[in-house]
Regions:
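ABC ATPase NBD coupling module
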Residues: 87-104, 130, 248-254, 299-304, ...
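Conserved ABC ATPase "signature" region
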Residues: 137-154, 408-426, 536
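A short, surface-exposed alpha-helical micro-motif characterized by mixed small hydrophobic
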Residues: 226-228, 498-500
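ABC ATPase "signature
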Residues: 244-245, 253, 516-517
Length: 543
C-alpha cells in the first residue's frame, strides 16, 4: 500500500534583505561604510537572532527595516522586501501604516521610548487607536499581565519614572504586541530584566510566535538567551554577516572563528578562591539597615503607608573579598548601594566602613572619608559628563579630595591609572561619546580607582555590555582586586555571571535577605524557595 503524505506547508519568507549597504556621514563629511552587503531572510513564524558586538551593525539593520534611520545615514544599495513590497521604495504614508499594523519594535532603552508626562494607560491606548473603547481598559490590563506585570491595575496609573527598568521594558513589550504585528523586532529586550522575568518574557515571545504566527527578529548579545528561543542565528561583525545557520548547528559546531570566540566568552569563569574567614576589621559592615519610602496618599486623614525598600539587612565584607547582592527589580539591592553612598535616607541601622559609622558622618569629615569607598554605575554613558574630556573626568575626584597634590603628581597618577585599566594615553583628550560601551566603563573604573578606594560598589556594571566586552571588564576587575586587595560589593540580577566572581552572596526579595552564605553553597545547595526559583530561571545555552 503506497504511503500517502499530507500536504507539506512551505514556509514563505516574510522578510528578505538583499545586499543592503549603508553609509554614515561623519562630521568631516566623509562617508563610512557601516553595513556591507547584508543579506538574510526571516520566514513566517520564525525567530531569528541577530548577534554581534556593539558597533557591528545589528541595530542599524533593524532601523533600516522600519526606516527610522538618522539623517546622517544613507542606504546606498540593496533591497528590504516585506510581504512582497520593497520597503525602501515605499512612500512615508505607506511606511507609517506598516509600522503601525505590521512591524513593531521594542527598543533597548525603554525610558527614552516612553513619554515621561503620560501615564502607562494613555501610552498603551495609543497602540489601540483604531479599536473600540469597549473593554479597552481590561484588554490593556490583560496585556500587561501577559508580560509579567501582576499588579497591572495599579501600574496603568503610574508614570515611567515611577517604574523600575525591568517594569518599563515590560510596558514597552506590551505596547509592541498590542496590535499583533506580523514581524516583531526586539532590540535587546531582556538586557535589563531579572532572570525570572526574562524567562517569562522569552516564554511569552515563543507563545506569541505560535499563537499569532508572528515572526521575530531578536537582537541580543546574550548567547544563552538566543539559544532558548531562536530557530536561526545570524552573526554580524564590523558591518558584515559572518555566519548564518540553524540554531542547533551554530551552538554545536559554529563555522566562523568569531562565532567560536563568542561562545568561549559567554562561558565566563575567572573565579579566584579566597580563604573566607571572619575578620575583626571588615571593610564593610551593615547592621539592621532599614530604608522606607512613604507611599503617595491622595486621601485626607488616611494614615501614612510605607514601602519597605530595605528591611533589616545585615552584610559583612572583608578586605580583598567580593560579596554579591542578587535579586529582581524592586528587591532593594540598588537601594542598599544608594544608602551606602548617602543617596537614600536611612530609617534605622548602621553602615560602617573601616569601622567608622558613615551614617553619622557630616560635612568635611564625610567628604574626606568618601575616597575610601566609590561606586561604578550601570550606565557608564549617563554617569560621565559628555562636555568634559576623559582626562578631566578621571582626575576630577582626585583634585577635589586631594587638593594638595600638584599638577606633575596628578599627571603621573593619571598615566598610571590609564595603564591599569587598559586605555592608551591618547584617550585623555577625547570625549565620552567617542568610545564604545566597554571603553566607557573602563573610564568609569579609572575615575574611581584613581582615589585608591578600599571598597568598590559595582551596580550592574556589565549588564549593558556584549559578552566579549563583559568578559574584558570582569577580567579587569578581578585582576585589580588581585593586585590591590580591594573589596567589591557587586549588585546584579545575573546570578550565573556573579557566581563566577563572588566569594559570598546574599539573595534579596521584597527588601529582605532571604538567603546568605558562600556562593558555592548557594549555587549547589540552595535552601530558600525563592533562591531555587532564581537558579531554575537562569538561561543556559541549549545545544
Amino acid at each position: 500500500m503506497p504511503l500517502i503524505l499530507g500536504p507539506i506547508k512551505i514556509m514563505n519568507n516574510i522578510l528578505t534583505i538583499k545586499d543592503l549597504c549603508l553609509n554614515i556621514r561623519s562630521n568631516n563629511h566623509q562617508d563610512e561604510k557601516v553595513l556591507k552587503n547584508i543579506s538574510f531572510n526571516i520566514k513566517e513564524s520564525e525567530i531569528v537572532s541577530l548577534i554581534g558586538e556593539s558597533g557591528s551593525g545589528k541595530s542599524l539593520t533593524a532601523l533600516s527595516i522600519i526606516r527610522l534611520l538618522e539623517k546622517s545615514c544613507e542606504i546606498k544599495s540593496g533591497e528590504i522586501i516585506f510581504l512582497n513590497k520593497n520597503i525602501l521604495s515605499l512612500e512615508e504614508r505607506e511606511m507609517r501604516s506598516i509600522r503601525k499594523n505590521d512591524i513593531s519594535m521594542i527598543f533597548q532603552e525603554p525610558m527614552r521610548s516612553l513619554n515621561p508626562v503620560m501615564n502607562i494607560r494613555e501610552q498603551i491606548k495609543e497602540a489601540y487607536q483604531k479599536k473600540s473603547s469597549i473593554n479597552l481598559e481590561q484588554e490593556i490590563i490583560n496585556n500587561l499581565i501577559s508580560v509579567g506585570i501582576d499588579d497591572a491595575k495599579r501600574v496603568i496609573n503610574l508614570y515611567p519614572h515611577q517604574l523600575s527598568g525591568g517594569m518599563k521594558q515590560r510596558v514597552m513589550i506590551a505596547m509592541a504586541i498590542a496590535n499583533k504585528p506580523k514581524l516583531l523586532i526586539a532590540d535587546e529586550p531582556t538586557t535589563s530584566l531579572d532572570v525570572t522575568i526574562q524567562k517569562q518574557v522569552l516564554d511569552l515571545l515563543v507563545e506569541i510566535k505560535h499563537k499569532l504566527n508572528m515572526s521575530i527578529l531578536f537582537i541580543t548579545h546574550d548567547l544563552a538567551v538566543a539559544s532558548q528561543i531562536s530557530d536561526r542565528i545570524v552573526v554580524m561583525r564590523n558591518g558584515k554577516i559572518v555566519e548564518n545557520s540553524e540554531s542547533k548547528k551554530f551552538f554545536n559546531s559554529p563555522d566562523h572563528s568569531y562565532s567560536k570566540s563568542l561562545l568561549i566568552s559567554s562561558d565566563y569563569n575567572k573565579k579566584i578562591d579566597h580563604h573566607i574567614c571572619s575578620s575583626d576589621n571588615p571593610i564593610l559592615e551593615i547592621k539592621n539597615l532599614k530604608v522606607y519610602y512613604k507611599e503617595k496618599n491622595n486621601f485626607f486623614f488616611k494614615p501614612d503607608t510605607y514601602i519597605k525598600a530595605v528591611d533589616d539587612v545585615c552584610i559583612t565584607l572583608n578586605p580583598g573579598m567580593t560579596h554579591a547582592i542578587v535579586g529582581e527589580s524592586g528587591s532593594g539591592k540598588s537601594t542598599i548601594a544608594k544608602a551606602i553612598m548617602g543617596l537614600a535616607s536611612i530609617k534605622s541601622g548602621s553602615i560602617s566602613i573601616l569601622n567608622k559609622n558613615i551614617v553619622k558622618m557630616r560635612g568635611s569629615s564625610q567628604r574626606d572619608f568618601r575616597k575610601n569607598y566609590q561606586m561604578i554605575f550601570q550606565d557608564p554613558f549617563s554617569s560621565l559628563n559628555p562636555r568634559m574630556r576623559v582626562g578631566s573626568i578621571i582626575k576630577e575626584g582626585l583634585c577635589f579630595l586631594k587638593p594638595e597634590i600638584n599638577k606633575y603628581e596628578i599627571d603621573k597618577i593619571l598615566s598610571d591609572v590609564m595603564i591599569k585599566v587598559g586605555l592608551n594615553q591618547d584617550s585623555l583628550s577625547k570625549y565620552p561619546h567617542q568610545f564604545s560601551g566597554g571603553q566607557r566603563q573602563r573610564i568609569a573604573i579609572a575615575r574611581v580607582l584613581i582615589l585608591e578606594p578600599k571598597l568598590l560598589i559595582c551596580d550592574e556594571p556589565t549588564s549593558s555590555l556584549d559578552v566579549t566586552v563583559q568578559k574584558q571588564v570582569l577580567d579587569l576587575l578581578v585582576d585589580i582586586q588581585t593586585k590591590t586587595n580591594i573589596a567589591y560589593l557587586f549588585i546584579s540580577h545575573d546570578i550565573k555571571l556573579i557566581a563566577n566572581i563572588s566569594d559570598t552572596m546574599s539573595i534579596m526579595n521584597k527588601g529582605k535577605i532571604v538567603e546568605s552564605g558562600k556562593t558555592s553553597d548557594i549555587m549547589n545547595n540552595a535552601n530558600n524557595q525563592y533562591t531555587k526559583k532564581l537558579l531554575s530561571s537562569v538561561p543556559a545555552i541549549i545545544k
